[in-house]
């Protein structure tokens, strides 16, 4: 992201590193935080600035099929509702869905996403709206004989994007899952990754059926099987992990594979509950993701934080499980770490100026007695008034020429493009 000049956000509350809150001013120069000037708060404040949220597992183009096939378990949902529609999607359709999904995320304070979908041009949708993205195309891992295409395509894409986006839209390594790829592909991609240094994005142990069928095929869990191919040697981030064992968690901690928790999607599809508190005990980095808008059915990371907090307290019969700060870090710095980034995810001098700015003046946010608790248990994406990516206000409710960068009509055009694609797909 490229920006010029100096910006100041004054008289704001902040979520700071070290699980601290503070009050004062944030100074942005270029694309980074240049200074944080703290001082005592002497009067009420209605502005909170927090790190931009990091959505670590998403399928943004699935805004095209939001809510389709509700009430079906995962395999039937995929085979009966989703795959038949996806088979008809054009690159134009996928681009429209990507742009709309990216805009939804920016409007809710998400500044960076790890997104998985197919289509050669789909990553451009994130670039178009000014959002950071780690993208990957799983389809190449499903069709036999496409390993070289996968490797060369990823290399050429990243070389091109270094110039166009300063590397902020970057392609990671990917397989859809253990059950939709083969050992030869995994070993080949592992060899390539030792040179390319890319992290692996994949689905893992989402359902009991998936987990047990892998054991029946290989005598190993999905994590153990994949680790044996070498494909996890460069680290990565595994979505779901609902049925992972303690031994799986130990492998993940050892190989620097983050667990991306998707509580809403897992509940909607009846998949179960990932044991994230146990994973954390065993040293796994736990991040947060929405999954796609067809299985969530929105991309609101505040809602994801709230649900993640509540379900694990209820399951454990223990209100001390997962503090608000634990949850906030899953949605910010843990997500950045999962993606291999140390320049985002925190409000600190020298970090990229990726900011989520929230209005605290809504009835459900007053009084603001405990800011971390308020963030996790009271806030919604709709409370976000501005989102800053690399120093640029990519979303700003107060902007006279339209909320999104690009002026009046930007959102209307994106909506029209999405609905035209939906009609073409016969939905």
Write out the residue ranges for each language-model feature.
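Active-site microenvironment of metallo-dependent hydrolases
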Residues: 1-24, 29, 332-427
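Divalent metal-coordination and catalytic microenvironments
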Residues: 12, 26, 31, 46, ...
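Active-site gating loops and adjacent loop-to-helix segments of metal-dependent hydrolytic enzymes
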Residues: 64-96, 130, 134-140, 208-235, ...
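Alpha-helical scaffold segments that flank or form the walls of functional sites
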Residues: 66-131, 153-164, 417, 423-427
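Metal-coordinating catalytic core of metallo-dependent amide/deamination hydrolases
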Residues: 122-242
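Catalytic core of soluble alpha/beta enzymes
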Residues: 206-230, 234-236, 241-254, 267-278, ...
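His/Asp/Glu-enriched, well-ordered alpha-helical/loop segment
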Residues: 228-235, 277-362, 378-380
């Amino acid at each position: 992201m490229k920006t010029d000049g100096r910006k100041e956000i004054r008289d704001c509350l902040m979520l700071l590193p070290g699980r601290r809150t503070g009050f004062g001013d944030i100074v942005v120069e270029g694309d980074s935080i240049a200074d944080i000037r703290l001082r005592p708060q002497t009067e009420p404040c209605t502005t909170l600035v927090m790190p931009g949220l990091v959505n670590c597992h998403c399928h943004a183009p699935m805004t095209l099929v939001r809510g389709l096939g509700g009430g079906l378990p995962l395999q039937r949902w995929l085979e009966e509702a989703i795959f038949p529609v996806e088979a008809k999607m054009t690159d134009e359709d996928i681009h429209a869905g990507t742009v709309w999904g990216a805009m939804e995320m920016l409007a809710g304070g998400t500044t960076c996403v790890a997104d998985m979908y197919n289509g050669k041009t789909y990553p451009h949708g994130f670039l178009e709206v000014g959002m950071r993205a780690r993208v990957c195309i799983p389809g190449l891992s499903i069709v036999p004989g496409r390993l070289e295409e996968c490797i060369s395509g990823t290399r050429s894409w990243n070389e091109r994007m270094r110039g166009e986006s300063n590397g902020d839209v970057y392609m990671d390594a990917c397989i859809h899952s253990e059950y939709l790829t083969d050992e030869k592909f995994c070993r080949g991609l592992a060899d390539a990754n030792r040179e390319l240094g890319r992290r692996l994005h994949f689905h893992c142990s989402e359902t009991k059926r998936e987990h047990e069928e892998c054991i029946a095929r290989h005598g190993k869990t999905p994590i153990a099987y994949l680790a044996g191919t070498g494909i996890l040697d460069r680290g990565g981030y595994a979505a779901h992990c609902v049925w992972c064992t303690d031994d799986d968690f130990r492998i993940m901690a050892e190989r620097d594979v983050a667990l991306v928790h998707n509580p809403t999607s897992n509940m909607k599809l009846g998949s179960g509950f990932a044991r994230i508190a146990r994973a954390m005990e065993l040293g796994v980095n736990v991040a947060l993701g929405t999954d796609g808008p067809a299985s969530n059915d929105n991309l609101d990371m505040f809602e994801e934080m709230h649900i993640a907090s509540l379900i694990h307290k209820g399951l454990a019969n223990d209100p001390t499980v997962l503090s608000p700060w634990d949850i906030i870090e899953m949605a910010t710095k843990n997500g950045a770490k999962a993606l291999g980034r140390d320049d985002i995810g925190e409000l600190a001098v020298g970090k990229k100026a990726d900011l989520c700015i929230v209005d605290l003046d809504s009835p459900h946010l007053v009084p603001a007695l405990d800011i971390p608790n308020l963030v996790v248990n009271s806030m919604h994406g709709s409370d976000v008034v501005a989102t800053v990516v690399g120093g640029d206000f990519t979303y700003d409710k107060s902007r006279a020429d339209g909320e999104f960068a690009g002026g009046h009509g930007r959102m209307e055009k994106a909506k029209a493009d999405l609905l035209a694609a939906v009609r073409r797909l016969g939905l």
